[in-house]
């Protein structure tokens, strides 16, 4: 679920898009309480209002008191299945209420200027969408790659200035990079494509950017979970068009909570090791004359364990 969808509807009901000062007042006076509660729950409403006010105030300082949009993209958790997406298998995943939010002002200069709390990002000129080896593993590469993915599919892109804040921990296993990719894709969709690009398409473009421009091998699970939102079952047997089924399920209704523990570690510098996983899994599949592991049975795998270890 993305706040932008709800916020645009609310603003349209008012008849116009609002400047940042007016959005701040709307947050303070409770006019967005229903939308924020839908995203984060009633117990988090007060803290989220403080968070949004702080982000909006900083955005006003950096971007000016201009007409703006707010976007949100969530992190994700794997409920069932890990490293099964790139093996054309199945997985159950869910978005979480930790997200990256951004205040965005459209521009006509074809440049993306992205300010983020805690780190700096160089402006990205969308006139140049070539792969840049020097940008490997950078935020700039993801922005450029998503813009390239949009144009390859015949969609429009354009410039914008943004200030963002994220509580999806980087390197914490919640897919902060996929959340960012979905955020950028959603911004391009809403600002320049009348919000007509599907969640699934945005996810695919995000994966393309991560694989080709960020240069990290990954399946489609992370982007799809962040983009589709809520609980979802995914079957990747059809590589180009995976089957995604939303599941109407709230763990709290059954007495369950998902607890995330910050163990003060990160896999942010392990991109090469992560990229090796699908290659190693496909190497095992090749021993059976198959492309991916979903094409062999569990019994075949167990019967040949010694051979696999030897190889």
Predicted stretch roles:
Residues 172-258:
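Fold-level recognition of mixed alpha/beta catalytic cores in primary-metabolism enzymes, strongest
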Residues 66-67, 86-90, 128-136, 166-174, ...:
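A short glycine/serine-rich beta->alpha loop
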Residues 73-88, 167-183:
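Glycine/serine-rich anion-binding loops at beta->alpha junctions
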Residues 113-115, 159-166, 196-208:
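Beta-strand segments within the central parallel beta-sheet cores of soluble alpha/beta enzyme folds
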Residues 88-108, 228:
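Structural signature of FAD isoalloxazine-binding scaffolds in flavoprotein oxidoreductases
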Residues 10-76, 101, 105-136, 233-311:
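C-terminal nucleotide
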